[in-house]
Amino acid sequence: MLSKQIPLGIYEKALPAGECWLERLQLAKTLGFDFVEMSVDETDERLSRLDWSREQRLALVNAIVETGVRVPSMCLSAHRRFPLGSEDDAVRAQGLEIMRKAIQFAQDVGIRVIQLAGYDVYYQEANNETRRRFRDGLKESVEMASRAQVTLAVEIMDYPLMNSISKALGYAHYLNNPWFQLYPDIGNLSAWDNDVQMELQAGIGHIVAVHVKDTKPGVFKNVPFGEGVVDFERCFETLKQSGYCGPYLIEMWSETAEDPAAEVAKARDWVKARMAKAGMVEAA
């Protein structure tokens, strides 16, 4: 029977680094999480996952079954290095190939949502042509995802092109496809000059998951919970009152910390306390 508990997950990069998914999922279970979000970033090491053998993919599936901890989503940030908006045709083609492989990987191991980075380009200067290429790349990507029944969900970013739900909704309306949705990060959303509550309400019906982290203006990573500008209780209240019932993912980068598990446990308790104050009693 499906649980009515609010699904709470942890980002892979919060946990100790390594390639043993059975150990990672066992640790996540011990720490009280329902799921882990996989990272496929721009490093060769994590990109190589998209070329895993059948046996390696099956090992992940078996680890999920054995532990009961799901891997329902992938954070695909590799497009920083190989952007869909690149004016270099070879780089852009590589970005589309990464997308194809990621969708196939997701289909094979049961990942339902691929979170996309909302960058047309990252290390280059953006212009009208990079934005056009990005739009066209998204259109091609969503066609692939539709055939595979895998949802692509764009993150609200630390970058002006996609720094609000309102902007992301523009792409959702442009693509007009149920396999393209939104994956807001309440930290990124709060670090810009946004009406956060209005933005969250505007996204309801398109939000498939929520990243939870703290931020400061101009500082989007590694801000300890409670030391930034995010009004967590109001964000959680707004999402609850708007009818959002989906997963929340604590995003941290503590994999190289002296004691990652202790850092994660501390963050989990802090976040769950704010959820409880917001009336999300299932999270207490």
From Swiss-Prot:
Q: Is the keyword Iron assigned to this protein?
A: no
Supply the induction statement.
Answer: Induced by L-ascorbate. Repressed by UlaR.
Q: Which GO terms describe its biological process?
A: L-ascorbic acid catabolic process
Pfam families the record matches: AP_endonuc_2
Q: Which UniProt keywords apply?
A: Isomerase
EC number of the protein:
5.1.3.22
What pathway is it annotated to? Cofactor degradation; L-ascorbate degradation; D-xylulose 5-phosphate from L-ascorbate: step 3/4
Give the record's family classification: Belongs to the L-ribulose-5-phosphate 3-epimerase family.
Name the UniProt record assigns to this protein: L-ribulose-5-phosphate 3-epimerase UlaE
Taxonomic placement: Bacteria, Pseudomonadati, Pseudomonadota, Gammaproteobacteria, Enterobacterales
